[in-house]
Amino acid sequence: MNRLMIVSLLGIATALGGCVNPPPKPNDPYYAPVLPRTPLPAAQNNGAIYQAGFEQNLYDDRKAFRVGDIITITLNEKTQASKKANSDIQKDSKTKMGLTSLFGSGMTTNNPIGGGDLSLSAEYGGSRDAKGDSQAGQSNSLTGSITVTVAEVLPNGILSVRGEKWMTLNTGNELVRIAGLVRADDIATDNTVSSTRVADARITYSGTGAFADASQPGWLDRFFLSPLWPF
């Protein structure tokens, strides 16, 4: 019995351990810096003022609009959510059956052991009651900045940007990743844009090391918080 219990606990620990998300790794190719697809031609030392390939429109600014350009995204994320659910289910039932006659004859007879007459009658009842109450709340805030590169320019002029930032601390690494779509008109003159202006944003803030491990519940805690716990 003890051996079976140990094997069962090891199986549960293994299953719950497999449900843990693997820690992020640096140098993800998807978030690697994107270089310009067409390199600028080499400048010619011919003494001319105009150099082919280096021209710029008189009304252009220095805002990013090409593949490989750099944009700084200011993180201003704040979310708050709450959820509450109540349920109450109750069911009562009662049934009574009695036969007083059969083919015109009475169904009561003298009880041979005393205590009154006997009759073919039955009565039963039942009651069920189930109640549930759940409440969840979550609040997140993320501020800071991250510099990314333009990965693609869509036909309508929308910029697809992505990038990551790794910070190595004494006790581990901190990671910020972001990817999304930016409208060129939302970019300020200093090549910055708020994260609230990034469409289809994918923002990841994670880390590795002692602090990240301390915030993760143990395998036994995950079992009690998982749907496998029957109570």
Curated annotation (Swiss-Prot):
Give the record's keywords alphabetically. Answer: Bacterial flagellum, Cell outer membrane, Lipoprotein, Membrane, Palmitate, Signal
Q: Which GO terms describe its cellular component?
A: bacterial-type flagellum basal body, distal rod, L ring; cell outer membrane
At which residues does the record annotate a lipid attachment of kind N-palmitoyl cysteine?
C19
Name one molecular function that GO assigns to this entry: cytoskeletal motor activity
> Does this entry carry the keyword Lipoprotein?
yes
Species in which this protein is naturally found: Pseudomonas aeruginosa (strain ATCC 15692 / DSM 22644 / CIP 104116 / JCM 14847 / LMG 12228 / 1C / PRS 101 / PAO1)
- Compartmental location: Cell outer membrane; Bacterial flagellum basal body
**InterPro entries under this entry?**
Flag_Lring
What NCBIfam families does this protein's entry cite?
Answer: PRK00249.1-4
What's the family? Belongs to the FlgH family.
Q: Which residues form the signal peptide?
A: 1-18
Q: Provide the gene name from the record.
A: flgH
Task: Give membrane topology per the record.
Answer: Lipid-anchor
Q: Name one GO biological process term.
A: bacterial-type flagellum-dependent cell motility
Pfam families the UniProt entry points to: FlgH
Name by which UniProt lists this protein: Flagellar L-ring protein
Please list where the region (Disordered) is annotated.
118-141
- Lipid-binding residues (covalent, S-diacylglycerol cysteine): C19
Described by its record, this protein's role is as follows: Assembles around the rod to form the L-ring and probably protects the motor/basal body from shearing forces during rotation.
Quaternary structure (record): The basal body constitutes a major portion of the flagellar organelle and consists of four rings (L,P,S, and M) mounted on a central rod.
Superkingdom of the source species: Bacteria
